[in-house]
């Protein structure tokens, strides 16, 4: 598909990105129409997709998108969570119309609906999950592009891009590659320089993981503030408190005099000691006298 042009050939960096994201890994099932895109089959039953065919169909899809004069006439759809963020980023980069989440039936066929649209091109993430927009596109003669896995049905799909459409990294990378090629063919960005947008922005992130990362970052910030307060704040305080230490040492001598006089005078004159000593002596004499009477 790229012909003899070296500019359109797949670079080594692109191959490494595909392999790192697992784009070449298909499923254990194979549709008969996807056999032409299969390279080999692993011992565990997983089919390996030919990345050369993936790159050729990616360029063909980019050419079809660029051929649309108004970018808003291109509808990009993803009902699965793994592709919703990528679809929104693709639409922001290329000017397409995104539909992330549930697709309202009748959007392409029911003119009474408030959300009725008449796009000129449709791009979906998964033909199996996005079967409703593909079916409606067939009613209105709408050309379609789809990211297809080894077991994806190709009914109503005009341009199938073979890839792994189950993994979050693979789906995000494919939408990133497609957006980059569209911008390159339009002349918005140059092929000589790398695109400043990273593929990580197109990856799906679990909300729970985002909350955990935010909590960890907040805890780290609190600990940093505590350490900075312990090591930096006391330095000026010690220098300012030095003259106060001399004042406290001088003031200790004043309350020492009444503390010594108060307990010594109270406890010195106590007649209680004489009373307690006299009481047992009197009792002793009485008991002695009693014993003499019995005798």
Swiss-Prot record:
Per the UniProt entry, the disulfide pairs are: none
Positions marked as site (Cleavage):
115-116, 133-134
Which Pfam families does the record match to this protein?
A: 40S_SA_C (PF16122), Ribosomal_S2 (PF00318)
Glycyl lysine isopeptide (Lys-Gly) (interchain with G-Cter in SUMO2), cross-linked positions: 89
Any one GO biological process: cytoplasmic translation
Its keywords, alphabetically, are: Acetylation, Cell membrane, Cytoplasm, Isopeptide bond, Membrane, Nucleus, Phosphoprotein, Receptor, Repeat, Ribonucleoprotein, Ribosomal protein, Ubl conjugation
Its Gene Ontology cellular component terms are:
cytoplasm; cytosol; cytosolic small ribosomal subunit; glutamatergic synapse; membrane; nucleus; plasma membrane; postsynapse
Region of interest (Interaction with PPP1R16B), residue spans: 54-113
- Predominantly, its location class is membrane
Q: Which residues carry this modification: N6-acetyllysine?
A: 52, 89
Localized where?
Cell membrane; Cytoplasm; Nucleus
How does the record describe the protein's post-translational processing?
Acylated. Acylation may be a prerequisite for conversion of the monomeric 37 kDa laminin receptor precursor (37LRP) to the mature dimeric 67 kDa laminin receptor (67LR), and may provide a mechanism for membrane association.
Positions of post-translational Phosphoserine modification: 43
As stated in the Swiss-Prot or TrEMBL entry, residues carrying the post-translational modification N-acetylserine are 2
Q: Where are the [DE]-W-[ST] repeats?
A: 230-232, 247-249, 266-268, 275-277, 293-295
Q: Which molecular function terms from Gene Ontology are attached? A: laminin binding; laminin receptor activity; structural constituent of ribosome
Q: Which family does it belong to?
A: Belongs to the universal ribosomal protein uS2 family.
Q: Which PANTHER family match?
A: 40S RIBOSOMAL PROTEIN SA
NCBIfam families with a match to the protein in the record: uS2_euk_arch
Q: What does this protein do?
A: Required for the assembly and/or stability of the 40S ribosomal subunit. Required for the processing of the 20S rRNA-precursor to mature 18S rRNA in a late step of the maturation of 40S ribosomal subunits. Also functions as a cell surface receptor for laminin. Plays a role in cell adhesion to the basement membrane and in the consequent activation of signaling transduction pathways. May play a role in cell fate determination and tissue morphogenesis. Also acts as a receptor for several other ligands, including the pathogenic prion protein, viruses, and bacteria.
UniProt miscellaneous comment: This protein appears to have acquired a second function as a laminin receptor specifically in the vertebrate lineage.
The entry's protein name is Small ribosomal subunit protein uS2
Record the organism.
Answer: Mus musculus (Mouse)
């Amino acid at each position: 598909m790229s012909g003899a042009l070296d500019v359109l050939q797949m670079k080594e960096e692109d191959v490494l990105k595909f392999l790192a994201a697992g784009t070449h890994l298909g499923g254990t099932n194979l549709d008969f129409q996807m056999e032409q895109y299969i390279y080999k089959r692993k011992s565990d039953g997983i089919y390996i997709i030919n990345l050369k065919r993936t790159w050729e169909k990616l360029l063909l899809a980019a050419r079809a998108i660029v051929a649309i004069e108004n970018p808003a006439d291109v509808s990009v759809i993803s009902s699965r969570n793994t592709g919703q963020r990528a679809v929104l980023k693709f639409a922001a980069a290329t000017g397409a119309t995104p539909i992330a989440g549930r697709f309202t039936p009748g959007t392409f066929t029911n003119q009474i609906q408030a959300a009725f649209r008449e796009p000129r091109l449709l791009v979906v993430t998964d033909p199996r999950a996005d079967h409703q927009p593909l079916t409606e596109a067939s009613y209105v003669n709408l050309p379609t592009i789809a990211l297809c896995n080894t077991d994806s049905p190709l009914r109503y799909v005009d341009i199938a891009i073979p890839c792994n459409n189950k993994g979050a990294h693979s789906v995000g990378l494919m939408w990133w590659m497609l957006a980059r090629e569209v911008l390159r063919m339009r002349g918005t960005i140059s092929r000589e320089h790398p695109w400043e947008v990273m593929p990580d922005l197109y990856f799906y992130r679990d909300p729970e993981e985002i909350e955990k990362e935010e909590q960890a970052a907040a805890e780290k910030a609190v600990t940093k503030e505590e350490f900075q307060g312990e090591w930096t704040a006391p330095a000026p305080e010690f220098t300012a408190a030095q003259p106060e230490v001399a004042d406290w040492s001088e003031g200790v001598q004043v309350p020492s005099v009444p503390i010594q006089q108060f307990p010594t005078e109270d406890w010195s004159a106590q007649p209680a000691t004489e009373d307690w000593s006299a009481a047992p002596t009197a009792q002793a004499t009485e008991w002695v006298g009693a014993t003499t009477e019995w005798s």
